[in-house]
UniProtKB/Swiss-Prot annotation:
Database matches in Pfam families: PseudoU_synth_2
Entry protein name: Ribosomal large subunit pseudouridine synthase E
Origin organism lineage: Bacteria, Pseudomonadati, Pseudomonadota, Gammaproteobacteria, Lysobacterales
Superkingdom: Bacteria
UniProt GO BP: pseudouridine synthesis; rRNA processing
Single Gene Ontology MF annotation: RNA binding
Keywords on record: Isomerase, rRNA processing
Catalytic activity as recorded in UniProt: uridine(2457) in 23S rRNA = pseudouridine(2457) in 23S rRNA
Active-site residues annotated for this sequence: 42 (nucleophile)
Chain's gene name: rluE
Species this chain originates from: Xanthomonas campestris pv. campestris (strain ATCC 33913 / DSM 3586 / NCPPB 528 / LMG 568 / P 25)
InterPro entries hit by this protein: PsdUridine_s_RsuA/RluB/E/F_cat (IPR042092), PsdUridine_synth_cat_dom_sf (IPR020103), PsdUridine_synth_RsuA/RluA (IPR006145), PsdUridine_synth_RsuA/RluB/E/F (IPR000748), PsdUridine_synth_RsuA/RluB_CS (IPR018496), RsuA_PseudoU_synthase (IPR050343), TruA/RsuA/RluB/E/F_N (IPR020094)
EC number of this enzyme: 5.4.99.20
Enzyme class: isomerase
Length: 187
């Protein structure tokens, strides 16, 4: 079974939390029993999260050797110039090593998304922009660290697709069961 969930902002990509006070978890969304997250989205990120009850499928979805592209819409602080975008495309050096090259483009206008709660801070004197970033890795907070490394701090991060699966019309907290056969074999 493969479940597509639009993970809201402020929710952990796990079913329990022992911190005090406890944070929101996947347990509140009425997901099918026995599924678990195949990959993660950090607490401050939102969007597509895949869940499955199939171990081999989870491996194919998360192992970097299978190169499942992950696509994000990223609101950044600043006005990206050509050199910053090219650096992201070429791959940047992070503290855990260089990233693979990425597909990056500036979106001409802000994507139509649901409101975030709490809203992203607005600074009238500092411009912001939206980027579409596609990577085939999945390091901890990778996209946030990549944009920060070129001087563009991330304000909002929404994963919109993983491989052949996309959010489509799912609203935050909504989920659907989908076809797991869309996983491409490793190249």
């Amino acid at each position: 079974m493969l479940v597509l969930l639009n993970k809201p902002y402020g929710v952990l990509s796990q079913f329990s939390d022992r911190s005090t006070p406890p944070k929101r978890t996947l347990a509140e969304f009425g997901l099918p029993p026995q599924v678990y997250a195949a990959g993660r989205l950090d607490h401050d990120s939102e969007g597509l999260l895949l869940l499955t009850d199939d171990g081999p499928l989870a491996h194919r979805l998360t192992d970097p050797r299978h190169k499942q592209p992950k696509t994000y819409w990223v609101q950044v602080e600043g006005d990206p110039d050509t050199s910053q975008l090219q650096a992201l495309c070429d791959g940047v050096l992070l503290n855990d090593g260089p990233t693979r090259p990425a597909n990056v483009r500036r979106l001409e206008c802000a994507p139509t998304l649901w409101p975030r709660d709490p809203p992203v801070r607005v600074r009238k004197t500092v411009p912001d922009a939206w980027l579409e970033v596609q990577i085939t890795e999945g390091r901890n907070r990778q996209v946030r660290r990549m944009t920060a490394s070129v001087g563009l701090p991330t304000l909002r991060l929404v994963r919109v697709a993983i491989g052949a699966w996309s959010l489509a019309s799912l609203q935050p907290g909504q989920w659907r069961v989908d076809d797991a056969r869309a996983v491409r074999p490793a190249r």
